[in-house]
Each structure stands twice: as structure tokens, then as C-alpha cells.
């Protein structure tokens, strides 16, 4: 039976509409994942302390909230990224920023010298909020980078944000930098009088951050930090066939070695664990050959695994048999930024983090997943 011209036209039109719909869905899906990740993360983990102040709850229990400088840094970073899409306003950013500014750390023998570094933890004790002294470098780095991004997203506030960025990056170099090891320390408490002065957190190796801070300040020390810390990370990666690096390492001017268990916080201080899992994310956007080589070694190890699990010894033995978004999200972000490098299979295998709702009782998993969505789904 011959079809009429109208029937052919209608069939063709339906086919075109169907194909166009599939294309739109495919194009819009990453955008939808980004928007939903941010919305769920914001609603679950942001707590407003007052009309002008908010913090990221890291405790996974809204009844017993805990703020960390790490979490506040991530919160500012994510909010600035959301602002690029119009999902966050400068007011949202400023509420998180005001909380940071209210909890700046003091240094000196009697903690009498104010800084722009953030005190590392706040929580409720006997019905009152208390803030623990000392800073944590990872939080300060993300706060500074978020300020830089915010200046571009909200131009009317740019001078204010840039001024704060300059103060903060200056204080990072003043109080969280060891010139003898060419590295950032883990916090302002690790002074030259401390046995931890030579301790390096591998996830603080942030070459693109350091490039940005140098371009903003023209302070040559940021180049020294970048070169020193990338050298140390490459040294650590080359010590094992896996290319994996530990959470923490002891460093000198020209050497690095993993720490022993319980040196800092846990039995896994010298393994690829809860801190080092962020390293792929921190190297993802760097074109420096040392960063690329270290990242490639690590990623090829992961690409050979049937499932990437939550942590490994540096020799490649699994620490756990379950998967974790804290480990998979940074890997997804790294592979999404570095396609055709010999580990593309990780793009599909680690995408599972977006196949289920954002965790509502795991701040770390949820936050790293949100960062991976915002930066890796473009």
C-alpha cells in the first residue's frame, strides 16, 4: 500500500522531532546533573547561622553541626561555580564568606596576631559555639581560589573579593609555607619549631591554584611552591609502580617519603586514602609535564582495576572492598579533563556517582561529587 505524501511528511516530521528531542536531552543532561547536584548539596549541607552568615555542615547531622575550614572552602568554591550558571547570587557567596571572616585565626606565642587564615573547626559545646584555633592549609587554598573566581562572576564585588584574596594568599605564604622544603605546610600550627614543619599534605599540591595566585600577586614564592611541591609529588609517585601517593609525606628541599601510620590522623596516613583521593582533582587542569606524568601514572593504575575502591596501599592493595564517591569523583573529574590519555574507560566506570541521588548523610562524598559535576560535566 502506497503512503500519501501527507503520511510521509508526518512520519518524517515525527522522526525529526524525536531525533531532536534525543539530542536536546543528551545535551541538557549534563546541565541538569550540575543544577540538581548543586541544588541538593546546598539544601542539604548549607546552614544559615544568621541573616548574613552561613556555613557548610560537615557533621552529617544537622542537629549537631560542625563547620570546617575545608568545608567552608569547598562551599565558597562550589557557590562561585554555581554563580557562573546563575544558580547562586553574590549574596549566597557573601553569607559563606562572612562566616569565614568571623572565624579567622590568630598566630603568635599568645595568639595575638590576626590573620586572614581560617580557624579549622567550629562546633557546639554545652550549648555554645566554640572555635578551635589553628588553620588547615587545604581550606585556605580553596577559600582563596573561590575569591578569585567570585571576582570574575560578580564584577560589582570584584575589588572587595580581590582584596581579600590578596590578604589571604599573603598570609598563606607568611604562615603556611616552609621555604626550606619549597612546600606549603599543613597549617599555621606547623611552625619551624614543630616536628611537623616538614610535613606535606599531597592534596595541597594545586598547581593551577598556584599559577593563579602568582598571576594575581606576582609573588615569585608561588612559583617556588608550585615547582617544589610538584617535584615532591612526582618523587612520591615514582616510588611505586602504581604511581599512587600517600595522604602525607615528609619532605626536604629535594626529597620526599611517605609518613608512617598514625603520624597525623590515622593508620592510613601513609596510604592513598581520604586526603590523597583528592590529588587527581587537584592535578586535573594542569598542563605542567610533572603534573601530567603523575596524574597519568595514577589514572592508568585505576583504569586497570575492575572496580576503583575506597583507598589503596601504595603498592596497590585495596584498603576496602566498597566504592566511594570521595575516591571516584576526583577520578571522574580528572578523566573528563584529560581524554585520549590512555584511561578513557574511567569516564564511563566512574560516572556511577551521578546515577543515584546525591548523598544526604556524607558531606565529603556529596561535596566532591558536586565539584566533579560542576567542573567535569562540561
Which residues make up each language-model segment?
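N-terminal Sec-pathway targeting helices
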Residues: 1-16
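Short glycine/serine- and small hydrophobic-enriched flexible loop segments
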Residues: 76-84, 142-153, 208-215, 281-285, ...
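Extended ligand-binding clefts on enzyme/binding-domain cores
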Residues: 66-70, 109, 115, 137, ...
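Low-complexity, Ser/Thr/Pro/Gly-enriched N-terminal "stalk/linker" regions
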Residues: 8, 17-70, 81, 87-130, ...
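Alpha-helical solenoid scaffolds that mediate protein-protein interactions
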Residues: 41, 82, 93-103, 107, ...
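Aromatic-rich carbohydrate-recognition surfaces in CAZymes
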Residues: 65-75, 130-151
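Terminal, non-catalytic domain-edge segments
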Residues: 21-25, 276, 282-285, 334-337, ...
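Alpha-helix boundary/capping segments in eukaryotic regulatory proteins
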Residues: 83-92, 131-139, 153-159
Amino acid at each position: 500500500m502506497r503512503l500519501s505524501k501527507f503520511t510521509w511528511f508526518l512520519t518524517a516530521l515525527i522522526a525529526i522531532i524525536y531525533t531532536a528531542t534525543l539530542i536536546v536531552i543528551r545535551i541538557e543532561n549534563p546541565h541538569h546533573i550540575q543544577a540538581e547536584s548543586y541544588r541538593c548539596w546546598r539544601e542539604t549541607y548549607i546552614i544559615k547561622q544568621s541573616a548574613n552568615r552561613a556555613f557548610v555542615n560537615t557533621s552529617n547531622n544537622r542537629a549537631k553541626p560542625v563547620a570546617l575550614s575545608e568545608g567552608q572552602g569547598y562551599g565558597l568554591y562550589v557557590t562561585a561555580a554555581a554563580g557562573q550558571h546563575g544558580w547562586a547570587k553574590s549574596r549566597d557567596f557573601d553569607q559563606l564568606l562572612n562566616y569565614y571572616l568571623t572565624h579567622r585565626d590568630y598566630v603568635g606565642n599568645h595568639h595575638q596576631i590576626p590573620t586572614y587564615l581560617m580557624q579549622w573547626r567550629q562546633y557546639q559545646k554545652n550549648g555554645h559555639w566554640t572555635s578551635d584555633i589553628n588553620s588547615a592549609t587545604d581550606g585556605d587554598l580553596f577559600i582563596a581560589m573561590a575569591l578569585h573566581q567570585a571576582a570574575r562572576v560578580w564584577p560589582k564585588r570584584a575589588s572587595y573579593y580581590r582584596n581579600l584574596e590578596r590578604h589571604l594568599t599573603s598570609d598563606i605564604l607568611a604562615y603556611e609555607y616552609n621555604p626550606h622544603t619549597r612546600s606549603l605546610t599543613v597549617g599555621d600550627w606547623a611552625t619551624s619549631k614543630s616536628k611537623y614543619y616538614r610535613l606535606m599534605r599531597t592534596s595541597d599540591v594545586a598547581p593551577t591554584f598556584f599559577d593563579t595566585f602568582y598571576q594575581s600577586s606576582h609573588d615569585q614564592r608561588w612559583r617556588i611552591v608550585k615547582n617544589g611541591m610538584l617535584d615532591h609529588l612526582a618523587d612520591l609517585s615514582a616510588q611505586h609502580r602504581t604511581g599512587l601517593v600517600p595522604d602525607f609525606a615528609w619532605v626536604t628541599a629535594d626529597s620526599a617519603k611517605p609518613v608512617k601510620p598514625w603520624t597525623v590522623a590515622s593508620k592510613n596516613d601513609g596510604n592513598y586514602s581520604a586526603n590523597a583521593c583528592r590529588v587527581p582533582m587537584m592535578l586535573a587542569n594542569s598542563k605542567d609535564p610533572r603534573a601530567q606524568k603523575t596524574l597519568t601514572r595514577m589514572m592508568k593504575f585505576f583504569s586497570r582495576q575492575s572496580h576503583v575502591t575506597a583507598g589503596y596501599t601504595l603498592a596497590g592493595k585495596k584498603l576496602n572492598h566498597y566504592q566511594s564517591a570521595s575516591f571516584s569523583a576526583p577520578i571522574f573529574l580528572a578523566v573528563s579533563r584529560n581524554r585520549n590519555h590512555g584511561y578513557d574507560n574511567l569516564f564511563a566506570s566512574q560516572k556511577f556517582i551521578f546515577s543515584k541521588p546525591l548523598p544526604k548523610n556524607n558531606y565529603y562524598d556529596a561535596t566532591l561529587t558536586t565539584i566533579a559535576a560542576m567542573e567535569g560535566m562540561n
